[in-house]
From Swiss-Prot:
Pathway connected to this protein: Sulfur metabolism; glutathione biosynthesis; glutathione from L-cysteine and L-glutamate: step 1/2
Species annotation: Janthinobacterium sp. (strain Marseille) (Minibacterium massiliensis)
Catalytic activity, reaction form: L-cysteine + L-glutamate + ATP = gamma-L-glutamyl-L-cysteine + ADP + phosphate + H(+)
Keyword Ligase: yes
Family matches, as PANTHER family: GLUTAMATE--CYSTEINE LIGASE
Claim: Ligase is one of the keywords in the record: yes
Record protein name field: Glutamate--cysteine ligase
Gene that encodes it: gshA
Cellular component terms (Gene Ontology): cytosol
Length: 528
C-alpha cells in the first residue's frame, strides 16, 4: 500500500472529513434495444408515449431509433439511482406495445444495414445535428456496431473532498485544476486495472452469427445462430465489438487534462482521406458533419471519459476547458443479462470501492510502453480472461490474472471498509467478497454463466436473449408504477414533446450555417 494511499485513507477516515464521502454522486445510463415478441429488432419510431428523444432527460435514444437509453439523475447513493432506473424500466415496459427490452449487450438479430433506423430528433438544428452525426457513424463504422448496448456508470467525488485532499498535500494548483488533474489520475489507474472489471463483469462471450455479416473472425461455432469464444468475457469490448481502423492510432494521453484535450481537439480538426472521399453531402442531403478523423469528440471510443455537464450547443472540450472535470463516465460495463436493470446493487457497490481506490492510490504518469501494456492486458482479458493460468503484463513482467486480481482486491478492501464505516454497514465488503469468489472460481463470472446457460439449453444466443427479455418484462410489469410515479413520467414525456415543438417553431437561421459554426467551435489553442 503506497504512502500516498495510506495518508489519504487516514485523512478521509477522520471524523471531521468522513461525511465528505457521502457527498459525491452516482448516475447510471442503461442502453437497450427494442425488440418484437420474436426477438427481432423493432423497426417502428421511438414511442410517442416515452416523450421526445431530444428533450426527455430520462428516456432518450442512442444511435438507433430502436436503441433506448435510460438515464438516472445523479444521486449521492447509488441505491437511489438504481431505484430510479427501476421506475424508468417499469414506465417504459408499460408503454411498449408488443415489444420487449433486449436483455443483452450484443444485438438481437438485425435486419439488413439499410433497414436499421437511425435515431431521429426532429427538425430543429440541434436535433438535425444529432441525426447527421449518426448518419456519419453509419458510414464510418456500419450500423450493426452502433446497435451494441452498454451500461455507463457516472461517478464523482465532492468538490469539498478534493479541496481537503489538496490542502493536506499543500498543492499549489487552484481548486479547479487540482480536481481536474485528480480525475485524470483516477483515469490512469482505471486504465491500468480495468481488465479486472472485464473479468468480473464481462457478460458477452457469445453473439449472433448475423452480427458479423461476413467479416473475418476467430470465433467458434456453438450452433447455427451462435458464435463464441470459450474463455471470452466481453466480445462487446473486443475488436469484434467497438472497433475502427481509423481510430487505431488515436490514443489521447492522460498525463494531464490539457494534453488530453489537445489530442481530441486535433482529431476533430484532422482531415481523414477516406472520409474526404465520401464528402459531407449526397444528393443535397447531409451525410456526416465533416470529413475529419472525428466528427465530434464523443466519437472517440473510450472505456472511460472525463466529463463536465455541457450547456446546450456546447462542445464537450469547451466545457472541460472552461470549467474543468466534474465527474468520470465508465463506459466498459456490459449489460448483465441476469439482472433486469442490467446491473445489480452489489456490482455498483464494488464499482464505488474500485473507483475510490483508483482516485486515492498513487497514479504514475504513463508512456507509450505503459499504454501498450494496458491495452494488451485489456484485449487479452476480454477474449480469453477465463483461460486457466492466463498471463498479463505488469511493468514488463508476466503475472497471472488471478494472482494480480487477488492482490488488487486486497488493496481495494481498504476503500470498501472506509465506505462501509461511513455507512455503518458491510455492503461494500460483501460486494468485494463476491468478486473474490469469481477470481477463485471462474465459473461464477457472468460470462461463464452465460455460456453455461447456452450449453444447458438450446445453445442459441438469440433464444437465451429472448427468454431473459421476456422474464425481465414480466418482472417489471408485475410491479406497475403508482399513480404519482406514473404522473411524473407522463408529465416528463408530454413536457419534452412540447419543448421539442417549441424549439422547432422558434429556431432561426440556416442549418448549413449552424453546422459550419459548430464545426469551427473547437478551439485551436485550449485553456490559454
Amino acid at each position: 500500500m503506497s504512502n500516498l494511499f495510506t495518508r489519504r485513507l487516514a485523512l478521509l477516515a477522520d471524523d471531521a472529513h468522513r461525511d465528505l464521502l457521502n457527498q459525491g454522486r452516482r448516475g447510471i445510463e442503461r442502453e437497450t434495444l427494442r425488440v418484437d415478441l420474436q426477438g427481432k429488432l423493432a423497426l417502428g419510431p421511438h414511442p410517442v408515449a416515452l416523450g421526445s428523444a431530444l428533450t426527455n432527460p430520462q428516456i432518450t435514444t442512442d444511435y438507433s431509433e430502436s436503441l433506448l437509453e435510460f438515464i438516472t439523475p445523479a444521486e449521492h447513493d447509488v441505491a437511489t439511482a438504481l431505484e430510479e432506473l427501476d421506475r424508468i424500466h417499469r414506465f417504459a415496459n408499460a408503454k411498449l406495445d408488443h415489444e420487449l427490452l433486449w436483455s443483452q449487450s450484443m444485438p438481437c438479430t438485425l435486419p439488413e444495414e439499410a433497414d436499421i433506423p437511425i435515431a431521429w430528433y426532429g427538425t430543429s438544428h440541434i436535433g438535425m445535428i444529432k441525426h447527421v452525426y449518426r448518419r456519419g457513424l453509419a458510414l464510418r463504422y456500419g450500423k450493426a456496431m452502433q446497435c451494441i448496448a452498454g451500461l455507463h456508470y457516472n461517478y464523482s467525488l465532492s468538490e469539498d473532498l478534493w479541496r481537503v485532499i489538496k490542502q493536506s498535500e499543500q498543492s499549489r494548483l487552484d481548486d479547479k485544476s487540482y480536481q481536474s488533474e485528480s480525475y485524470i489520475s483516477l483515469i490512469r489507474n482505471f486504465q491500468r486495472y480495468s481488465w479486472l472489471l472485464m473479468y468480473l463483469f464481462g457478460a458477452s462471450p457469445a453473439l449472433s452469427t448475423h452480427f458479423l455479416r461476413g467479416r473475418e473472425h476467430e470465433l467458434q461455432t456453438l450452433s447455427d445462430d451462435t458464435l463464441y469464444l470459450p474463455y471470452a468475457t466481453s466480445l462487446r469490448m473486443s475488436d469484434l465489438g467497438y472497433q475502427n481502423n481509423a481510430q487505431a492510432g488515436l490514443m489521447p494521453p492522460y498525463n494531464d487534462l490539457e494534453s488530453y484535450m489537445r489530442s481530441l481537439s486535433r482529431a476533430v480538426r484532422q482531415a481523414y482521406p477516406a472520409y474526404e472521399a465520401i464528402g459531407t453531402r449526397r444528393n443535397g442531403e447531409w451525410i456526416q458533419l465533416n470529413t475529419n478523423l472525428l466528427q465530434i469528440e464523443n466519437e472517440y471510443y473510450a472505456t472511460i471519459r472525463p466529463k463536465r455537464v455541457i450547456n446546450s450547443g456546447e462542445r464537450p472540450v469547451e466545457a472541460l476547458c472552461a470549467r474543468g472535470v466534474q465527474y468520470i463516465e465508465v463506459r466498459c460495463m456490459d449489460i448483465d443479462p441476469f439482472e433486469p436493470l442490467g446491473i445489480s446493487l452489489p456490482t455498483s457497490r464494488f464499482l464505488d470501492a474500485f473507483l475510490l481506490f483508483c482516485a486515492l492510490d498513487d497514479s504514475p504518469l504513463t508512456d507509450e510502453a505503459n499504454n501498450r501494456e494496458r491495452t494488451e492486458n485489456f484485449a487479452r482479458t476480454v477474449k480469453e480472461g477465463r483461460r486457466p493460468g492466463l498471463l498479463l503484463q505488469r511493468d514488463g513482467a508476466a503475472v497471472k490474472l488471478q494472482d494480480w486480481g487477488l492482490e488488487l482486491l486486497e488493496r481495494i478492501q481498504a476503500t470498501a471498509d472506509l465506505l462501509d464505516a461511513q455507512r455503518a454497514d458491510s455492503q461494500h465488503a460483501q460486494a468485494l467478497a463476491a468478486q473474490k469468489e469469481k477470481l477463485l472460481d471462474a465459473g461464477l463470472t457472468p460470462s461463464a454463466r452465460v455460456l453455461a446457460e447456452l450449453q444447458a439449453t438450446d445453445k442459441s444466443f438469440e433464444q437465451f436473449g429472448l427468454r431473459q427479455s421476456i422474464a425481465h418484462a414480466e418482472y417489471f410489469r408485475a410491479r406497475p408504477l403508482n399513480a404519482e410515479e406514473n404522473f411524473y413520467f407522463e408529465t416528463l414525456a408530454k413536457t419534452s414533446i412540447a419543448e421539442q415543438e417549441e424549439m422547432e417553431r422558434t429556431q432561426s437561421g440556416d442549418f448549413d450555417a449552424f453546422v459550419e459554426a459548430y464545426n469551427q467551435r473547437t478551439p485551436q489553442q485550449l485553456c490559454d
